[in-house]
Design a protein with these regions (language model features):
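ATP-dependent small-molecule kinase phosphotransfer cores
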Residues: 27-101, 152
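ATP-dependent NMP and nucleoside kinases share a basic, alpha-helical "lid"
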Residues: 73, 86-135
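Cys/His-rich short segments
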Residues: 116-161
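Conserved lysine of the Walker
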Residues: 13
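NTP-dependent small-molecule kinase module
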Residues: 19, 148-209
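Hydrophobic positions on the alpha1 helix immediately C-terminal to the Walker A/P-loop
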Residues: 16
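Hydrophobic anchor at the beta1->P-loop junction of P-loop NTPases
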Residues: 3-5
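P-loop (Walker A) phosphate-binding loop of NTP-binding proteins
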Residues: 8
Length: 209
């Protein structure tokens, strides 16, 4: 079973992926996590990625696909994956279609206001990379490993609007691509919803596959 989680940054893709891993045994693959891993290691590819993300720009398709395909080929992905943050362009969707059968695309639809609120209150652990939402997690240290929490540069106000604009510019044709393939399911999220509220809708659809 291979699933794509689609939606703007801050819509809750990471939380939904965590639930799907727990309940269906899928491997969570986040392009953002893969990028940060490459950057942390300061590999040649990581330095290339860093030059884009540090200024709020999109990482080019060919670089993103190279990183992702290398991960999908690993043995632990044989039972199925949940892709978080990929594809982000129609070219990426078409390239993915050639190498991996996608069973379902779940698009989490949120307003700009929700994105601004959630990203503005999102913090990451410096030690293990776990993301915490200040609205739900009333803590000052990582609840997974006890590490220090910090706000990523691209979660700060000056970058959020640019990320939204980039997302909207490409996402319509991606949704059309999967809608035409009868693989698209849209979840309309609300600001007052907890991650568990949203996941109840997602789980019901996935369980029917």
């Amino acid at each position: 079973m291979n699933i794509i989680l689609n939606g703007a940054s801050g819509c809750g893709k990471g939380s939904m992926a965590g639930f799907l891993v727990r309940d269906f045994g899928l491997v969570h693959i986040s392009t953002g996590d893969l990028f940060r891993e490459q950057i942390a290691k300061q590999t040649p590819l990581g330095k290339k990625v860093e030059s884009y993300v540090s200024t709020g720009k999109w990482v080019p398709d060919e670089v993103t696909i190279e990183v992702l395909l290398d991960r999908i080929k690993q043995p632990d992905c044989a039972k199925g994956v949940v892709l978080d943050g990929f594809p982000r362009t129609l070219n990426q969707a078409k390239a993915l279609d050639k190498v991996l059968n996608i069973d379902l695309v779940i698009a989490i639809d949120v307003t700009d206001e929700i994105v601004q609120t959630r990203l503005g209150g999102r913090y990451m652990c410096r030690q293990c990379g776990t993301i915490h939402a200040a609205r739900w997690d009333k803590i000052d240290k990582c609840k997974k490993c006890g590490g220090e929490l910090y706000q990523r540069d691209d979660d700060k106000a000056e970058f959020i609007q640019k990320r939204l604009e980039n997302f909207k510019k490409n996402n319509g044709e991606i949704l059309d691509f999967y809608r035409d393939a009868n693989k698209l399911f849209v979840v309309h999220d609300k600001l007052e919803n907890t991650p568990a509220d949203t996941y109840a809708l997602v789980k019901d659809v996935v369980a029917k596959l």
